[in-house]
């Protein structure tokens, strides 16, 4: 080296001597002297301040031997990303006293050059005293980057030249919530700890799981070691560049995304980094670290004062939460409130099930039905609870050293279900663009578990007959989320839905939790193939039939009962001892093609079934409307309609009719009836008579053709057929509507017994799903587009006469009779008198 040249600093020494279990920090001694020097350097005055180190040219030895390895592909574009680490090398950044005019050299030294060298005799002998072993920290901010002006310029330029992620830190500095952890309740006052394995309980390997273990899933324990990802070293980079990189021991990741949003949660030992971004809102980030840890904020490079910590609530007994976002106090208050609530979730419990239960309830919250389209505050709350449930699940599993089989399957199933609800119901995602992945299992163990679950699904479908186990088989296929699993259970799921529909037509009320759960997962596995691409003809036919039967199961009475059941369940759930699991309260209306459940007539029906309560009428009406709107949006997948009912979205002349369908009835493989409040320009149209002119109903038979015509509905008392064995009604749909414009039912005639029942007409005193005591009109829709009016099934209004009116009428008749009798008596007395005068 020349006399005028002296080297002064190393910001990061990326050396890994075997298994290193700690992060070390070194501060350049001249750091404080160089605080103001970073303002002097500009790499590109057109785009702003950007510092980049020089790298040797590999083609120019001898310095070229220290060039970055080719696999890193370090360029001026990739250098700012700080992806400098390579396992076979250690990197050294060398700067001079001329910094920042001289940006320094980034050199790479192969580790083989450093290992096995003889000791340097000029250096003092190493001490023989072994240092006291310290446990590796769970979270370690890499302050080496903070304490070097060169790195500070790089990170600050990225945070402040590109964008300012936290323009108003005071808006994100808020007090702790009411239900977060305290000194007396370090896990939160409402926390219900997850179950722990009993002393001596056996840990079952996943390769030995059988149906008996599924029967006893709540007492079957799996060892965490080998099943979940082992904690590994990882450098977490804040996407907003608002803080410095953080060294963590990662345990997995949760990712949810679609065409309109992306959520990514990185889990670690006592760490979570959650990023939520949407097309309709600025991105937000939540970082959870141990209580004694602090994350420094990246400050303005023009500010001589060092920046403080990231904003967020004060630290708790176990964790400290930091909140990042571009929200200001002038923004929408609901967005700030939602972000504050998300920041409190990690300190409100340790049980994943409580967070999933709260997320399901949040989906049906009052503002869930307030408006259509994306709702960032609701999406933030849903995904915040979803991510926190994963954080709690992983932490509890590692802390206990074991995980319950029912908890493992429950977490995987409910998190997937909630991800779909959040994406479609709150973010406005297209249904066929949603993707979801939870990477908390060891890759090898995951493959073994999936293979075993696939085998158990096949065994359940082959051997078992109970509805509960079949529902569990569909749930396992839903967890596996693979085409082979869906194809394996699809025939059984379709048969189950047909069987439940037959019981419904026979008068059985399908209200038990196991029936709801079976319908939920059976409907899910039949609808799922369209997400993987274009469904096959068999998949489309199964899905169309399941949608038709779900619509048939969703009568007006069922819709009102569903609303009442959800209200009761939500009011009863405390998310501690009583949890709210949506599949146990699933309604076929949510998987149907009925989009009219939020209309006023249905709201009144639901309110009529409400039990006595102290809840004000206005609040009850708002809750009822919110639940109905949520059910309608849940069912209304535009992508699902395009995939399975393409004739309903067929465009003619380059444009589709701007008419919102109220009900779709896929009656054949390529034709559907649609109910609307306005006429459609194509198809065979019928105007339904006897309906309030303010809410008219139009029925249209649609195919892929663009021709349009209108017909009149033919009236018949009963269907007359020539062949008593085959009445020709199988495949038709029985539809009933009221004068108020409410479609009460659309029932599929799918068996000979059902068609015989319709041909015979209603029976006095015999209850039937085809009868009603509400004034209404009955139609029969045929697969060929013909519609007839079944007069025998109509219900005519009966005049209601008050008892007082009847008594007054009877008294009037008696008085009139008495008056007539008196007149006759007078006449009889007077007639002889007239005769005498003559």
UniProtKB/Swiss-Prot annotation:
Keyword annotations from UniProtKB, A to Z: Fusion of virus membrane with host cell membrane, Fusion of virus membrane with host membrane, Glycoprotein, Host cell membrane, Host endosome, Host membrane, Membrane, Sialic acid, Signal, Transmembrane, Transmembrane helix, Viral envelope protein, Viral penetration into host cytoplasm, Virion, Virus entry into host cell
Region (Interaction with gL): 259-323
Region (Disordered): 174-204
Location in or out of the cell: Virion membrane; Host cell membrane; Host endosome membrane
Modification note: N-glycosylated, O-glycosylated, and sialylated.
Pfam families the record matches: Herpes_glycoH_C (PF17488), Herpes_glycop_H (PF02489)
Stretches of the chain found on the membrane's Virion surface side: 19-803
Signal peptide: 1-18
Coiled coil: none
BP GO terms, sorted: fusion of virus membrane with host plasma membrane; symbiont entry into host cell
CC per GO annotation: host cell endosome membrane; host cell plasma membrane; membrane; viral envelope; virion membrane
Chain ranges passing through the membrane: 804-824
Protein function: The heterodimer glycoprotein H-glycoprotein L is required for the fusion of viral and plasma membranes leading to virus entry into the host cell. Following initial binding to host receptor, membrane fusion is mediated by the fusion machinery composed of gB and the heterodimer gH/gL. May also be involved in the fusion between the virion envelope and the outer nuclear membrane during virion morphogenesis.
Subunit-level organization: Interacts with glycoprotein L (gL); this interaction is necessary for the correct processing and cell surface expression of gH. The heterodimer gH/gL seems to interact with gB trimers during fusion. Associates with the gB-gH/gL-gD complex. Interacts with VP16.
Family label: Belongs to the herpesviridae glycoprotein H family.
HAMAP family, alphabetized: HSV_GH
Name of the protein described by the UniProt record: Envelope glycoprotein H
Gene assigned in the entry: gH
